Curated annotation (Swiss-Prot):
Keywords per UniProt: Nucleus, Transposable element
Gene: NOF
Major localization listed first in the record, in broad terms: nucleus
Subcellular location(s) of the protein: Nucleus
GO cellular component entries: nucleus
Name of the protein described by the UniProt record: 120.7 kDa protein in NOF-FB transposable element
Disordered, as annotated region: 716-749
Organism encoding this protein: Drosophila melanogaster (Fruit fly)
Primary role: May be involved in the transposition of NOF-FB and other FB elements.
Skewed-composition ranges (Basic and acidic residues): 737-749
Biased composition (Acidic residues): 724-736
Domain of life: Eukaryota
Length: 1056
């Protein structure tokens, strides 16, 4: 007797009727919808939500039919009007659509799918099968064909195809179901096709175009493997773009195209299959198993767990290295990160894993010698790795190049020289003191020059400094790398220290040339003619810090003597009346002295002792190898990758490189047999061609002596020889574009290691800030935070114009810069000028500008209007940095006179009141001479005699507004005063002090009673002019010097 159901049919129908289980189109809601869980809770969990949805989908006991009748929902019978013909009527070449009113809310599409013979054979039943059934990939083929015929968004799940004509004379039946919209697809074929013919399948499906769908077809079986194999060498996003061939405009996305996460998963699976990686194992266990089985057996030498390391090398590597080391005794060693994922520890911690690599120059490419992955980066780990390299290869290198990592240097020295790097430096220095080569280590250790230059460039001493200083001292270090004797190195470093420590330069009061100026000229002359040997500057930030090594006392004393001698000479160069030294940088001495203690590693002083043929210590080989490894060999991965995947792929690439390298070595050593030379066909040529070839050969006999092989540039295009005929030149012009595309691009040598003939002109040219952007007017910007207040500043053009000219003068005029740096450090505007000149525009600069402007106004509102006459603005901004200082002195000191309180009177702006002259030059120069002249007069307070003297400041700011307006009101019927920049004197002499014109500020009157605008014109050191308008984004060149303008302010800065 069957068991009694927990819920009878009537109760279940009532529950379905009360709940909204249908969508707007009349289809059942998906299983993930909340309504099924609500019905299950209403039935007290007697039937699960999943089972309820299943009952509804299969219409168990016609329950859904009864529910639709009660709810008044028209039933969608997708099988209605299904004919039993071999095909549907084909009046329309595409498909036929029934009326929606006849069959429910959605119309039914009828169309035929034609499968050619090749496509049908790919899914047809196989002959050797016991039961007739389609091949597993038939569902994917049908999905593509249906979308190509009608772009439906449905992701149909197909049931098992029925192949039999015994029931209703239909040989093939297929049926699919869409989980999103509950549509049912049906197809049939009445007659079994012949073996040499294709098949036509009649399909009926609801027209669901325009209904949003979210589901995708599952990617399984052979299609999953096929897509995964395609994705190994292709990005997932690119694969999706290429899979849209069947799509037209406004078509929905095909359901058979997987989304990006699925494609990435398929790529990972295919990569694991390709590498033989099992995902359920951790990387260390996977490497341990591969050490003893598979293609990596014998390649992995040592594995460590805590801290993780893995040393690996192939047998072919060892054989090739043994052959190469006989002719090339130099290797490069370096480390890089960002290739392997960190190994997680049980407590959740992890450490970075570095790849340590030894490479050497090969005949065909860069040859990798030995490698290690390690999460520990100390001397002991590196020494153990190199000791395994020695025991495995059995050959010592004579020269090793590395970067400035003390852990790496100590490991190299302990392995190849059996002493620490400090002892190695001591032995090398003692050999320099002796003429004979005694007690010299067997291996020559050198530092990579590119790492050295980059390390110098990143020193903090160059921060907030003008770029000239960094360029000059970095070129000096480049000079020191070429020193081949101890004495020449000491002379050069002494000159550098003298220049860096001396505050003054030029000539003293007696007319004698200072030592700082003499050494400055000596270094500039060396820079103008110096050229370092060729090297590549592709470097990475992989220096591993370690404690400072204790250097031998003899080396320390040698460097200290250089330092003491330089300090003594620099002390004599600190004269007050001389010009400031533009290269004064005392902060450079400590890092430079520390670097000089390792001078035997980065100069050429030991080159002759070790009989090295290389002029430069360069690790460009290993850096280029790292670049190729990351961008080419590991391009199938998204770096960083698991350690086991990396090792497998790396060993495969190493084996490929070794095969090519051994083939190149064999090709180089094997001689061409004599019978091939004897039987070689002789080329025939005319007399003219023969004579032309003889001329080329004669030239090449001399030219080949000047050529050298570059291991990184292969098949370099040869430039055409001069003197070719017109036809050859035309051919070269036609192929010029092709040759340029085939020629690989060489990375140029670093600028600090090239000669610079115009170095003095280079250092005197006008410099730019870090960005070309200028200060923007506060009215065109948003508010800024000043402390806890959000303030908006309007019409900041007066202040911006002043800051633009002063910052430009700070960059171009070194004497003016030194005055501001040494004597005026309390003024907020001057500090803003310095920050703007060195760092450029930034958000913090606008906050500082707001802080300065806020101090000028007492307004408590959030919007501060800064419109004011620029003369009064300058008096507030440059308080304490005057254009002139007045000194009143009584001939007979009268202590009772009240005028003594004003003995020091400062002026920020000088008003030019002289009128009646023809141009600005005739207004300014006489006024300056008269203003700064000494005057005798009577004191207005006590009646005694007094002397008035005025001294100019670091700058002289002239307000010529009233003078020009008065002049034009007299001579030009009251029009505003206008002039040109050509009429403004470029230099003025005040009390034997030279002042140069640095800029002018123009006032542009507004129309309609609005506020006018100020624009700054900056004059650069070479005489060119620039317009700095804070309503524009960038500065612009200004060449129309004859343009009439209303100048209000002239700014002169002190030159000497």
């Amino acid at each position: 007797m069957p068991a009694k159901p927990q819920v009878d049919g009537h109760t279940l129908v009532d529950a379905f009727c009360c709940a909204n289980i249908f969508t707007e189109t009349g289809a059942l809601k998906p299983r993930s919808d909340k309504v099924w869980m609500d019905i299950s809770n209403q039935l007290k969990g007697a039937i699960s939500a999943k089972t309820l949805n299943f009952y509804a989908r299969i219409n168990r006991n016609n329950m859904i039919t009864v529910v639709k009748e009660r709810c008044g929902i028209q039933q969608l019978d997708t099988s209605a009007n299904l004919t039993l013909n071999s095909t549907f009527p084909d009046d329309d070449p595409e498909f036929q659509i029934t009326e929606a009113s006849k069959n429910g809310p959605l119309p039914i599409l009828y169309f035929n799918l034609e499968l050619d013979l090749e496509l049908w054979r790919s899914i047809a039943p196989k002959k050797d099968q016991k039961t007739e059934k389609l091949q597993p990939n038939w569902t994917d083929t049908m999905a593509k064909l249906i979308y190509k015929k009608v772009p439906l968004p449905c992701a149909f799940n197909f049931r098992k195809a029925k192949l039999s004509d015994k029931v209703d004379n239909i040989w093939l039946r297929i049926e699919g179901y869409c989980n999103d919209c509950s549509s049912i697809l049906k197809g049939h074929c009445l007659v079994k096709p012949d073996e040499q013919c294709g098949i036509m399948i009649s399909v009926s499906v609801p027209d669901t175009r325009g209904i949003p769908h979210n589901k995708k077809r599952r990617c399984t079986g052979s299609r999953r493997l096929e897509i995964g194999n395609e994705l190994i060498l292709k990005k997932a996003a690119l694969w999706r773009k290429e899979a849209t061939d069947n799509m037209n405009d406004d078509d929905p996305e095909p359901s058979y195209i997987p989304n990006l996460p699925t494609l990435r998963k398929l790529r990972e699976e295919a990569t694991n299959r390709h590498l033989g990686i099992t995902k359920d194992r951790d990387p260390v266990s996977s490497l341990y198993l591969k050490k003893y089985e598979g293609e990596l057996a014998g390649c992995i030498l040592d594995i460590g767990l805590d801290e993780f390391f893995c040393i690996y090398c192939t047998g072919t590597q060892v054989k090739t290295y043994a052959s190469r080391i006989k002719t090339i005794r130099k290797i490069s060693i370096d480390a890089t990160g960002s290739v392997v994922l960190p190994i997680q520890k049980p407590n959740g911690d992890s450490s970075y894993v570095f790849l340590y690599q030894i490479v050497m120059e090969g005949d065909d490419s860069i040859f990798p010698v030995f490698q290690m992955l390690s999460a520990k980066h100390d001397t002991a780990s590196i020494q153990f790795w190199l000791s395994r390299f020695i025991s495995k290869s059995g050959h010592f290198p004579l020269e090793v190049v590395s970067d400035f990592s003390l852990a790496l240097l100590n490991g190299i020295s302990l392995s190849f020289n059996e002493c620490r790097i400090a002892t190695y430096i001591k032995k090398c220095f003692h050999s320099l003191l002796m003429e004979e080569r005694t007690d010299l280590p067997p291996c020559y250790i050198r530092l990579d020059i590119a790492h050295l230059i980059k390390m110098i460039c990143r020193k903090n001493v160059f921060k907030s400094k003008l770029p000239n200083l960094k360029d000059f001292y970095t070129r000096c270090i480049g000079l020191a790398t070429t020193c081949e004797t101890k004495d020449s190195f000491a002379e050069l470093i002494k000159s550098v220290l003298i220049v860096a420590l001396s505050q003054s330069s030029g000539e003293d009061e007696k007319g004698d040339i200072l030592s700082s100026y003499r050494n400055e000229k000596y270094l500039l002359a060396r820079i103008a003619t110096f050229t370092a040997p060729d090297h590549k500057e592709t470097i990475e930030d992989n220096c591993i810090p370690e404690d400072q090594e204790e250097i031998d006392e003899d080396v320390t004393d040698f460097i200290s003597n250089i330092k003491i001698a330089a300090e003594e000479e620099a002390l004599n160069c600190n004269s007050v009346n001389c010009r400031p030294n533009p290269y004064f940088l005392p902060e450079l001495m400590p890092p430079l002295i520390k670097l000089c203690k390792y001078f035997v590693l980065w100069t050429n002083v030991m080159k002759e002792k070790f009989c090295s043929k290389y002029d430069v210590g360069s690790s460009a080989l290993v850096e280029a190898y790292f670049k190729d490894l990351k961008n080419t060999d590991m391009s199938i991965f998204h770096r960083p990758v698991r350690a086991d995947k990396f090792v497998v792929q790396h060993i495969r690439c190493i084996e490929a490189v070794c095969k090519l390298e051994r083939a190149a070595m064999k090709r180089k050593t094997v001689k061409t047999p004599s019978f091939i030379k004897e039987n070689a066909p002789k080329k025939m040529c005319s007399k003219e061609t023969k004579g032309f070839l003889e001329e080329i050969l004669e030239e090449s006999e001399v030219e080949y002596l000047l050529q050298e092989e570059n291991w990184k540039v292969k098949n370099k295009t040869i430039k055409p020889t001069e003197g070719n005929d017109a036809e050859d030149n035309d051919t070269d012009d036609e192929n010029k574009e092709m040759d340029l595309s085939e020629q690989p691009k060489e990375k140029p040598r670093g600028k600090y290691l090239k000669k610079c003939p115009n170095v003095e002109l280079l250092y005197n040219r006008p410099h730019r800030r870090k960005q070309d952007e200028i200060l923007h007017n506060g009215g065109s910007m948003g508010p800024v935070w000043i402390g806890k207040q959000l303030l908006q500043f309007k019409n900041t053009c007066p202040f911006d114009s002043l800051v633009e000219i002063l910052s430009t003068a700070y960059i171009d005029n070194f004497y003016y810069k030194s005055l501001l740096d040494d004597f005026y450090t309390d003024n907020l505007t001057i500090e803003l000028v310095k920050k703007y000149a060195v760092e450029g525009v930034s958000s913090s600069l606008y906050c500082d500008r707001g802080l300065v402007l806020k101090s000028f106004f007492d307004e408590k509102h959030q919007i501060i209007k800064c419109d004011a006459n620029i003369g009064s603005f300058i008096e507030k901004a440059l308080n304490g940095v005057p254009s002139a200082s007045s000194h009143r002195t009584h001939i007979k000191n009268n202590h009772d006179c009240r005028n003594q309180k004003y003995i020091h009177h400062r002026l920020e702006v000088i008003d030019v009141e002289k009128v009646g002259h023809l141009d600005v030059q005739e207004v300014v120069i006489p006024f300056i001479d008269e203003f700064f002249a000494r005057t005798d007069g009577e004191c207005k307070i006590c009646g005694g005699q007094q002397i008035l003297e005025r001294q100019p400041g670091p700058h002289v700011i002239l307000d010529i507004e009233f003078a020009m307006d008065a002049f034009h009101q007299i001579h030009h019927n009251g029009l505003p005063g206008t002039t040109t920049l050509l009429q403004v004197p470029e230099e003025i002499l005040i009390q034997e002090k030279k002042y140069i014109l640095s800029g002018a500020i123009e006032y542009v009157p507004a129309m309609g009673g609005e506020i006018g605008h100020y624009i700054a014109y900056c004059r650069r050191v070479i005489g060119s002019w620039e317009v700095h308008n804070d309503m524009c984004r960038q500065w612009k060149k200004f060449s129309a010097l004859n343009t009439k303008m209303t100048l209000h302010i002239l700014i002169y800065t002190r030159k000497n």
